[in-house]
Amino acid sequence: MLFFDTETTGLSGGTGTRAFMVGASDFVPGGLRVRQLLITHLSAEPAMLREFSRWLAEDTRLVSYNGRCYDAPLLAARYLLARQGTPLAGIEHLDLLFPTRRRYRGVWENCRLATIERNALGIVREDDLPGSEAPGAWLQYLRGGDAGLLRRVLQHNFQDVVTLAHLLLHLAAPDDARTGGA
């Protein structure tokens, strides 16, 4: 299983939207491995896409949070525009948003990942940069700005892909083994 998340230049998902960061985690002997790819100039996108492709094998199962509707289609479009075949076609993809909604809709105010982290997993992010601020942080960096905000985007993405692994284990646990009030 490869848990993955992207940070992008916007939420529209059109051809002008780029993934400037791809994060992924997977279970390896000894624990959870996290890998991140970040482009620091626009011409690096094809190389980032090629490297992400190397992380995928025929038996890979993707796991995401809203990735079936957003991250995977966005990456597929970027592979097409880079004239690279998409490695995502035909790969099994589990989007944790849907089982999470089935379980927690109406229990909490929403099913945003931060809400699920706090209420179901007991994770409270300290000094987290909201994902909505990631595009601005990246663009500021490209324009010669401080890398401090970009480091916060990396940390945000890191936490997202770690949380996905915890959430899958939480959702798979028997009801009496779960914590978090639901």
Which residues fall in each region the model found?
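Short beta-strand->loop
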Residues: G10, S64-Y65, V124
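Surface-exposed cleft-lining segments at the edges of enzyme active sites
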Residues: T8, R35-I39, L149
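Short conserved beta-strand segments at catalytic cores or DNA/RNA-binding microdomains
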Residues: R18-G30
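Conserved DEDDh/DEDDy metal-dependent 3′-5′ exonuclease domain
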Residues: L32-A120
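Acidic active-site catalytic centers that drive phospho-/nucleotidyl reactions
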Residues: D5-E7, D71, D95, D160
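Entry/capping segment at the start of metal-dependent catalytic domains
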Residues: M1-T17
